[in-house]
Amino acid sequence: MLMKKNASFEDFFLLLGFSNWPHLEVVLFVVILIFYLITLIGNLFIIILSYLDSHLHTPMYFFLSNLSFLDLCYTTSSIPQLLVNLWGPEKTISYAGCTVQLYFVLALGTAECVLLVVMSYDRYAAVCRPLHYTVLMHPRFCRLLAAASWVSGFTTSALHSSFTFWIPLCRHRLVDHFFCEVPALLRLSCVDTQANELTLMVMSSIFVLIPLILILTSYGAIARAVLSMQSTTGLQKVLRTCGAHLMVVSLFFIPVMCMYLQPPSENSQDQGKFIALFYTVVTPSLNPLIYTFRNKDVRGAVKRLMGWEWGM
């Protein structure tokens, strides 16, 4: 009886995605494919360059490489499925596939929230505690911070995704989204989901609001340090590196807050799809451009790498 009531691994979900706008599907396919390729190329470029050039073996670029790898995994967890659904008439995903997708989307999104806090602490230590920076950001400690970001994401996701799929899905298998996400799946349940919705709100507050508060606190201290600087060169370098990180933080947290920290409503469902599309497709493609644009360290690394290749 329980097997009949609950979904089995042979069941499928139908991802409605952008089926309300069939005339946009071809355009969306092309645009999303372009952004996905930019994401792959840009983030792989940062990872490879940071690995090959010894001058970039610093805490800042170590964390940036982790962020790039996170973005690669995050987009790959949902975008290929979306492209397949946009290209052809088949818009289904298996129960097992939906479970795996939800797990990785939650895990990688949570890990990115924590990693952005770690990166803001690195900037705080560099600007406000420059004499103690090498001690504060010891390579071993940096590896521990990066590992903590990943572990917190995957641990939290294991609990949250299990809690989501624990409820019986008694209705149709129509998921009104382009990937498996918690609010869309909760709408398929025929039982009271207030506990799940409360859990979602609490987890969103812990891993969205608290990281954002910590980041803003770090940059408040950085702002005070910047205002007291006498060196124009130092000021420009701080503004360049911290400005890039602040822009990345804004592009990630603002859409996520609009998505998960507002009351659910029927009217906002379509709007939510485009918000989710922004932080899963656009933001990961912009991060490499933001960090490398007019970045002297990256330009120098490219010149050294090209010079080494030509010298060979």
Curated annotation (Swiss-Prot):
PROSITE patterns: G_PROTEIN_RECEP_F1_1, G_PROTEIN_RECEP_F1_2. Pfam families: 7tm_4 (PF13853). It is found in: Cell membrane. It is a multi-pass membrane protein. Glycans are attached at residue 6. Residues 51-58, 122-140, 221-237, 294-312 are cytoplasmic. InterPro entries: GPCR_Rhodpsn, GPCR_Rhodpsn_7TM, Olfact_rcpt. The chain crosses the membrane at residues 27-50, 59-80, 102-121, 141-159, 197-220, 238-260, 274-293. GO terms for biological process: detection of chemical stimulus involved in sensory perception of smell. It comes from the Eukaryota. Keywords: Cell membrane, Disulfide bond, G-protein coupled receptor, Glycoprotein, Membrane, Olfaction, Receptor, Sensory transduction, Transducer, Transmembrane, Transmembrane helix. Coiled coil: none annotated. One of its GO terms (molecular function) is olfactory receptor activity. Residues 1-26, 81-101, 160-196, 261-273 are extracellular. Disulfide bonds join 98-190. Its main location: membrane. One of its GO terms (cellular component) is plasma membrane. CDD domains: 7tmA_OR2B-like. Belongs to the G-protein coupled receptor 1 family. PANTHER family: OLFACTORY RECEPTOR. Odorant receptor. This is Olfactory receptor 2J1.
